[in-house]
Amino acid sequence: MVNKEITFLINSLGGGGAQNLCVNIANGLASRGWDVSLIVLNAKKSVFHKRINKKVNFKILGTSNTRYSFNVLHNYIKTEKPSKLVVFNYELTVMMYFVRLVSLKKFILISRNINTISKKKENLKGIWIKYFVFPLINFFYKKADHIVNQCKSMQDDIVKHYKLDVKKTSVIYNPVNGIIEKHLLKYEIESKKEGYLLCVGRLESQKSFNYSIIAFSNVLKIFPNLRLKILGEGSLKNELIDLTITLGVNDKVDFIGFSSDVISYYSKAKATILSSLYEGFPNVLIESISLGTPVVSFDCKSGPREIIENGINGYLSNYLDVNDLEAKILLTLNKRWNYKSVAESAHKFKLDLALNNWETLLI
């Protein structure tokens, strides 16, 4: 008999892409008859817990972070005895390797790779992360039984970085948010766009919103009535606000913060802009095109090249080239888009396809 029991482990359910995906996959598998458990370390800034399907066994372990999680995780494994564990975090994967070692419990340890590992290594900050946490990750992360990557370029990167057997890895594209899919069953693609560009994500160095703001300030010379809306929170908010003041565009840039109504922002934007230094697989681009809004993105590692079809659903910009980013935004604003065709380009990212792939992996 097929064992359809699976446990997902993540640090929290804050407003990030990994957390969103974790809930979507857990809900989807539970709806397909799986015995699903979703375990989080803590409920800090929890955004997605209200969306968890009642069929999912949800448990909060009550520990502040991964560093202090060994005892509660060890107790959980001894008590619940999961057969398969999918972990959505580098540090947690390493911790679970040690828990398995000490507990002598046999379970399959699967890790979902959340970023382009080589780029993450290049952009480490902080003594604790750089000289202790990441060296541990670098040595022990590959001890997971299987690593799921969000796109082909991520898979290529991690196989090369760790010299892994490619059979120990797989690719499962992130699906379109289930809430967006439900929205699209009820409503037509929005054809009346409003006068703004959109950026979505954490206000942190990896997302490098400064490039988007600079490009936008130049685009204003051609489209003076345009606005830029930025959805997200983070430690660089004040620094980015200062940049808008320096560029003289602070009256044209709206820092919205976190919003639960992201569908409305995507649907009505003229375009969504992504200027990240690197990504795992940018859900922002998938969400935008699925709602019919074209995208402009740096050709960063990894993901944009596997999502964007130039002239069909948006444009790729040369990496870290703010002048080319500006040029591609202007190209997007001047083009007459078939918004339904933009949305159709997201077909390969449907939730059902992702769930099929997860089931194939887990059975």
What are these regions (language model features)?
Residues 309-322, 330-336:
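Conserved acidic donor-binding segment of nucleotide-sugar-dependent glycosyltransferases
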Residues 3, 8-67, 235:
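N-terminal strand-loop element at the rim of the active site
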Residues 87-95, 113-114:
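Short His-centered aromatic/hydrophobic patch
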Residues 142-169, 176-178:
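A short, active-site helix/loop in glycosyltransferases that binds the activated sugar's phosphate group
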Residues 16-24, 195-221, 235-241:
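A conserved mid-protein helix/loop that constitutes part of the nucleotide-sugar donor-binding site
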Residues 294-298:
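Short hydrophobic beta-strand element within catalytic cores of glycosyltransferases
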Residues 74, 128-147:
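Membrane-proximal helix-turn-helix segments that form the acceptor-binding/catalytic region
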Residues 258, 277:
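Aromatic "clamp/platform" in nucleotide-sugar-dependent glycosyltransferases that forms part
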